[in-house]
Amino acid sequence: MGVVSCGTTMLDQGVFENIGAVTWDTTAKTSGFTAVSGNGYFCNTTSSAFTVTLPSSPSAGDIVGIKDYANTADTNNITIGRNGSNIQGQAADFVINTEGRSVVLVYVDGTQGWKVTSSSQATDIVSPQFITATGGTVTCCGDFKIHTFTSPGTFCVSNAGNAEGSNSVSYMVVAGGGGGGGGEGVADPTAVTGGGGGAGGYREGKASTDCYTASPLNAPDGLPVSVQGYPITVGGGGSAGTSSPREGANGSASIFSSITSAGGGGTPGITGGTGGSGGGVRGACSAGNVGAGNTPPVSPPQGNPGGILTVTSSPYGAAGGGGATAAGGTNGPGGAAGTGGNGATTSISGSPTAYAGGGGGGDGFPGTTSGAGGTGGGGGGAPPYNGSTNTGGGGGGAPASPGTAGSGGSGIVIIRYKFQ
């Protein structure tokens, strides 16, 4: 007969543990028999259930192994007959009724009899499974796949993986930036100037299996996925203000699964707009109200407030829009405008990239210092620049003249996971 020996016990398919001297008979048994101490047996109950009878008059240290050969013990049980000795301290036979089960029994004494020292199933050994998905533009970075969505789409998961491989994804969801505010359109020190648009909300989560350098706004973990299609929404940037109307519009939200990033705040009048990051206050003779960021509130925060006015005398410089990691800058004397708040830098795409910078404010006439856009795609204030595409940057506010501002940059969604 074929044997597997050398003082080992087979627990499961190809797995061994050093627990006793067992020689495994590799010719499967198909009917009842009496076991011999020191042997292990593969029992095939495909045709019918049967009984394996333990040795009579055993001695301490005797050992027998039994393995369900064809994974049929759940329908055709393997009964281990006690042959006059106790099993697990009970005067009762032992039944293997679980598919793929293997057991090893060692005789201890007359009280406990045969004790089960090892028991396992084929399902106890779990092979790593990895997420498989499609959608967006797919690139690879080592053992990780990266799906980038710059427009609406669907992230389709066909295999959700498992804990031994991967079953959660890292994500970055950036909304569209707010539009910058328009200027009055006249070359006059008393002319109104436009505040910078707030950056789109920035949200990021890094899976525990991932290894890239995340931003300071990284959530504690990624998102688990299941086999389904996840609709992806990529928010557009808010439209720019002009000399009439001066109001810049809010950006639109970006969405992946349970993660929603709010559009950046625009510049609706004297008050900065609320949103993922708030819009900056326009330059005028009154201070106005701050544009709130992280609206609606989430943790970690998705953005910061827009800047306020610290100078309300002419020439009027405007405040900058908020960014992912910093509030918008305040204005200064002589028509100086506030800078946009800086965005967040992450390597989720495979290289360090900044996103969600606030737009700079427009400078007063005669202006000397316009507001620079925040790192991460924020538009500058002179001439007013648009927020960068697919960064969620806020649009730059317009100076007194000309009066047209920059529009907000569109958002982006990036999903990353271990695939091998």
Annotate the PLM regions.
Residues M1-A49, S56-I63, K67-Q420:
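Glycine-biased low-complexity/repetitive sequence motifs
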